[in-house]
Structure formats: C-alpha cells, structure tokens
Amino acid sequence: MTTPLPAKPARQTAAFTLIELLVAVALALIILFAASSLLISSSRSSSDLQVRNDLLQEQQIAQNYLIANLREAAYVYPQGTTLNLGSGVTTQRPGGGAWVVGSSTAPILAIVKAPELPVSGCSASNDRACYKFKAYYPVVRATWVSGVGAASQNNPGADPSNETSWLLVEYTKNLVQTTPPTITQLTDLAPVGLNGESGKLLLDYVQPAVTGLPPLFEVPAAGPQAAGQTRVTVNLSVSRAASGKIVAVPARASTDPATWVQPVLVAPRNVGRLTP
C-alpha cells in the first residue's frame, strides 16, 4: 500500500489592495503635477529672460544712436518751443495737439545736427554736408501699427497686450543751404518749415508717461547755448507685457516711477557756434 504524498501548501501571491492602488495613483499624480509645474515655471523664466535680453539689447542700440547724434548737435531747441512736424500718423502726438519741447506727457527732443562735411558742399544729393533737423518723440503703438500699413518696414506688428506702449520715433529733415543757419532762422523754422517728412521707428515698447516718472527728455531753458554748459538728460525706460507679467529695462526694484530710469546726461559739443 502506497503512502499518499503530503499535500503542498497553497501558494500565496502578493496583491495590492484598492487603498494601496489609490495611494499609488495619488502619489504619481502629485509627482507629475510637481514636474509639470517645474517645467512650466522654467519655461516662463526662460521666456521672461529672453524678452528682457531683447529689450535690453534694443534699448542700448537705440540709446547709443540717439546719444551719438545728440553729441553732434549745433543747436538744441529749448523748452517752450512749438514744433510743426505735419499731421501724418508717424508724427502724431500722444493725446493730440502740437508738439511742445519740455512737455512731460508727450516729450520731444529737437536738435540741429552739424554736418560731417563742409556746409559749402550741401545739396539735395550731398546731405552729409548739410545741417540736419532731427526730432525724437513718442507715438502710441496702436496708432502707429494701424496707420503705417502692414507691409511697411516701419511696422513692428500688432501686440494686443501692449497697444498703449510708446514707440520712439526719429524724424529727419535736411536743411539744404550752403551756409550755416542762424539761430533766428532755426527758430523761425519751428512753426512752419520743418514738416514734409515721415518719422522712422527707432525703438519699440517705450514706457509711456505716468505720474512720478521723469520725462523722457529734459532740455535746457531758452537762452545762449555753449559747449560744456548746455546739457540734455535722456531718461529712457522700456517695458513690455509678456505672459501676464511686466518685463522692464532697467529692472524695477520699486513701485516708485522715479526709480524706473537710469538718466544719461549728454553735453552737445557743437553748440554755441551758430550766429544769432
């Protein structure tokens, strides 16, 4: 008679309970959410940094160009001067009305730049020998974009988040004459003889005027001008709304608009040489 083999014990297999599965799923979701938040935050930080770098580079280029022209000025139109630059969209003053040097709400810098070559050779085909009237002023971004035409090289493109931002514009008119202008002639040109040209886009996303913000340009009062004594202050600040945040250059360490600029003081080297 054979002895039956002893029965093998039943093999137990490990299994997750419903509660354990729910806990595991919850932990996985938490980890996924944290990783997603980190990725989004990193992406936004990278985007903000790119916007800031772009603003900084464009501001520096425009500011250096403006300052280089200002240093060569033979005359700076003083506070209180009314300028007629025409009625086109590229010369449209924020808020309307006439351009007045010294305005804080719609600032304008107007100069006459000395020629690179002897003025005796000035002609329509040789403008390097001509004195040049130059003005720098803001135009509301939405006004400019809608008015210059989509195909224009001067059109930076629509940006609904920044429609009220300013563009900094350069306006140039050659003074075609073979002798240096007098101060009286330049003064007489201001209300009637400087229109007929179009402004060119110099810088995008310029900070509009707000209470407490230093004016974009601070120019001398009326009176004799002399090299080393006549000075102009440029208070250039740029800001852009991007991804729900304001990115500004210079960076804003305070909510006080008085701290939003880094003033640059410029002394034109050719003033005082023109006869009254």
Regions found by a protein language model. Give the residues of each.
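Aliphatic-rich helix starts adjacent to a transmembrane/signal segment
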Residues: 2-67, 71, 75
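Intrinsic low-complexity, intrinsically disordered segments enriched in polar/basic residues
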Residues: 2-3, 64, 88, 178-179, ...
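Intrinsically disordered regulatory regions flanking bHLH/HLH domains
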Residues: 53, 100-101, 114
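Short, glycine/small-hydrophobic-rich surface segments
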Residues: 72-109
